[in-house]
């Protein structure tokens, strides 16, 4: 193997740049030519390629986002689109592809291998942390720290005004961010897609906390469970006073990655190149315990990842 490519796809996650840097520098150290694909699968179809040298990735580890840029490509979801991408790969003599992204991106990588035998290795990067068979995805730790910092600031003003704040965080199908953020900030309630919410019980809990002298309430809701406005309507009707809503939105995706995310991304980037050199393809690099392992992409994607129900109960007891 002499020439490989790397792309970032789907929603950006802090640490993607660190993974790109590792792929490029480790690849170059092993005598490989490394090609960067701009704009994810859209760039793969269009042939938007750039050769990346050692110096091109200097100083990017600490940067959020992705220097390669990213996109969500509808064309790549078609067989015709993937055929165009495969033709570009073969035309440019690329012998292996590292795909950094979430569920959709990894599915695309698998299809490239299944349909066109393009050697691919996936690196899980998504702040939702909803990919199976890996304990952690790139970007999760940074996102959690961003949410934690925001909630702590909201608690200051919530206490000053004796108010209840409803904080909506990302997580369409997974409540991981909401659960962990709620646990570490001592939120009074955590609403996640995996567990049905009883608004009457929630209101009773908030009112009971008020009777015990607590002057603020923080409710963290994952976007996939309910909108913050829906939660507010249900609660205000039952508790009899106004709430305040904060939707953190895309601020959760940005920012300089934490030390934990940088280390994970750099390690996964190195392991991805090793997997290609070893001829072990159609695999995803996963963190299990404290060890990086290679698992089949579709096995990871077909393994449903759920939140820790015991941790959810602990968060409730400690709030």
Curated annotation (Swiss-Prot):
Cofactor(s) listed in the protein's UniProt record: Mg(2+)
Residues noted as binding ATP in the record, renumbered to the chain: 11, 72-73, 102-105
UniProt KW Magnesium keyword: yes
Entry's Gene Ontology cellular component terms: 6-phosphofructokinase complex
Keywords linked to the UniProt accession: Allosteric enzyme, ATP-binding, Cytoplasm, Glycolysis, Kinase, Magnesium, Metal-binding, Nucleotide-binding, Transferase
Main subcellular location of this protein, as a coarse class: cytoplasm
GO molecular function: 6-phosphofructokinase activity; AMP binding; ATP binding; fructose-6-phosphate binding; identical protein binding; metal ion binding; monosaccharide binding
Metal-binding among keywords: yes
SUPFAM superfamilies with a match to the protein in the record: Phosphofructokinase (SSF53784)
Swiss-Prot/TrEMBL catalytic activity: beta-D-fructose 6-phosphate + ATP = beta-D-fructose 1,6-bisphosphate + ADP + H(+)
Activity regulation comment: Allosterically activated by ADP and other diphosphonucleosides, and allosterically inhibited by phosphoenolpyruvate.
Alphabetized PROSITE patterns for the sequence: PHOSPHOFRUCTOKINASE (PS00433)
GO biological process: canonical glycolysis; fructose 1,6-bisphosphate metabolic process; fructose 6-phosphate metabolic process
Stored Pfam families: PFK
Location of the protein in the cell: Cytoplasm
Gene3D superfamilies cross-referenced by the UniProt entry: 3.40.50.450, Phosphofructokinase domain
Superkingdom in the source lineage: Bacteria
Family: Belongs to the phosphofructokinase type A (PFKA) family. ATP-dependent PFK group I subfamily. Prokaryotic clade 'B1' sub-subfamily.
Function, as annotated: Catalyzes the phosphorylation of D-fructose 6-phosphate to fructose 1,6-bisphosphate by ATP, the first committing step of glycolysis.
Xref: PANTHER family: ATP-DEPENDENT 6-PHOSPHOFRUCTOKINASE, PHOSPHOFRUCTOKINASE
Protein name: ATP-dependent 6-phosphofructokinase
Lineage: Bacteria, Thermotogati, Thermotogota, Thermotogae, Thermotogales
Underlying gene: pfkA
């Amino acid at each position: 193997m002499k020439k490989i490519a790397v792309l970032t796809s789907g929603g950006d996650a802090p640490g993607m740049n660190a993974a790109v840097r590792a792929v490029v520098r480790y690849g170059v150290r092993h005598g490989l030519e490394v090609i960067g694909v701009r704009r994810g699968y859209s760039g793969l179809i269009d042939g938007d390629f750039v050769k990346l040298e050692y110096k091109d990735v200097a100083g990017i580890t600490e940067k959020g986002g992705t220097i390669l840029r990213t996109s969500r490509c509808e064309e790549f979801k078609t067989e015709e689109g993937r055929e165009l991408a495969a033709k570009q790969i073969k035309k440019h003599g690329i012998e292996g592809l590292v795909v950094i992204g979430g569920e959709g991106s990894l599915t695309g990588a698998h299809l490239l291998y299944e349909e066109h035998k393009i050697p691919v290795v996936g690196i899980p990067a998504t702040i939702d942390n909803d990919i199976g068979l890996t304990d952690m995805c790139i970007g999760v730790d940074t996102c959690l720290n961003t949410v934690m910092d925001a909630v702590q600031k909201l608690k200051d003003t919530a206490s000053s005004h004796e108010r209840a704040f409803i904080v909506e965080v990302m997580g369409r199908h997974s409540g991981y961010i909401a659960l962990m953020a709620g646990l570490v900030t001592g939120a009074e309630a955590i609403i996640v897609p995996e567990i049905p919410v009883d608004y009457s019980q929630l209101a009773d809990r908030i009112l009971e906390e008020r009777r015990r002298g607590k002057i603020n309430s923080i409710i963290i809701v994952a976007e996939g469970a309910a909108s913050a406005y829906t939660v507010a309507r249900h609660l205000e009707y039952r508790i009899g006073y106004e709430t305040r809503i904060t939707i953190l939105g895309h601020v959760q995706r940005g920012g300089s990655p934490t030390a934990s995310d940088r280390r994970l991304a750099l390690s996964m980037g190195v392991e991805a190149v090793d997997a290609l050199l070893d001829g072990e393809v159609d695999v995803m690099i996963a963190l299990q315990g404290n060890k990086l392992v290679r698992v089949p992409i579709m096995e990871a994607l077909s393994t449903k990842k759920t939140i820790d129900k015991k941790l959810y109960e602990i968060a409730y007891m400690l709030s």
